[in-house]
Amino acid sequence: MKQSKLGVLMVNLGTPDAPTPQAVKRYLAEFLSDRRVVDTSPWLWWPLLRGVILPIRSPRVAKLYQSVWMDEGSPLLVYSRRQQKALAERMPEIPVELGMSYGSPNLPDAIDKLLAQGVTKLVVLPLYPQYSCSTSAAVWDAVARILKGYRRLPSISFIRDYAEHPAYISALKQSVENSFVQHGKPDRLVLSFHGIPKRYAQLGDDYPQRCEDTSRALRAEIALPAEQIMMTYQSRFGREPWLTPYTDETLKSLPSQGVKHIQLICPGFSADCLETLEEIKEQNREVFIHAGGEKFEYIPALNDDKGHIDLLEQLVRDHLSC
């Protein structure tokens, strides 16, 4: 029997090509038009998106991107490319490509590169530790949609998530412990996850449970009393209720409870991006300090840390053997 030619597709959310209103508008239009992300009727949503949201938000969000943009480009893309390079170096016998659900490098090009190399078994690795219909399922949809254009399909191994994987928890633990060594132990360690509308969870999305699974596993490994480790949700958008407690409201309330020193990590982000570097590290730090807090330290995402690449390699090799 002919041996399968293996390949890996790493997928993250995406980013604008530049920190400009025009580039941000293109990116947000693609992102917010995905029915997995916003499931409001297109007849209602698209006029609102194009007529109100994009014209107002694009210049505002572009300024935020400008504050975190790196010499090499968007932080999310920079760190994702470093992850791809590091994983490819670990597995030189297997082609590894990076694609973004929205923006560039796009998924069709990444898949085309892999199939052009003769890949017959494809491992799809969404870089989302906790499954959600708005992220991981959107990757599934996109890959299936792209492959409809091919006559000859590869077999697919889809990594749904890795919320409790021992190597993932170990990498998070190491990041937290490094922060404790550098800054001392805080009064509270805050685990801030990206939020989703409560309605999505009520309709069956198990994302909240997967966030709780990660938090529970990490609490068991961290040298702090369990009551000093908190879980919150950030980045809410729109008017409907999202998962609570909200990160910003929690940070605003902590100083009045005697909490003066916090450290915050975002376990659901595999790479630093606008939501971690600007929303958390800058905006939410200001919220905490303005409310009377004294010390705030942001613990970076796993990015291309060795422990993170160890995890990604283990995930892929486990699925290649399936």
Curated annotation (Swiss-Prot):
Residues that coordinate or bind Fe cation: 194, 275
Pathway assigned in UniProt: Porphyrin-containing compound metabolism; protoheme biosynthesis; protoheme from protoporphyrin-IX: step 1/1
One annotated GO biological process: heme biosynthetic process
InterPro entries according to UniProt: Ferrochelatase, Ferrochelatase_AS, Ferrochelatase_C, Ferrochelatase_N
Keyword set, alphabetical order: Cytoplasm, Heme biosynthesis, Iron, Lyase, Metal-binding, Porphyrin biosynthesis
Reaction(s) this enzyme catalyzes, per UniProt: heme b + 2 H(+) = protoporphyrin IX + Fe(2+)
Record's subcellular location: Cytoplasm
Lineage: superkingdom: Bacteria
One protein family per Pfam: Ferrochelatase
GO MF annotation terms: ferrochelatase activity; metal ion binding
Major localisation: cytoplasm
Broad enzyme group: lyase
GO CC field: cytoplasm
EC number: 4.98.1.1
Function comment: Catalyzes the ferrous insertion into protoporphyrin IX.
Family the entry assigns: Belongs to the ferrochelatase family.
PANTHER family: FERROCHELATASE, FERROCHELATASE, MITOCHONDRIAL
Protein name (Swiss-Prot/TrEMBL): Ferrochelatase
Organism: Yersinia enterocolitica
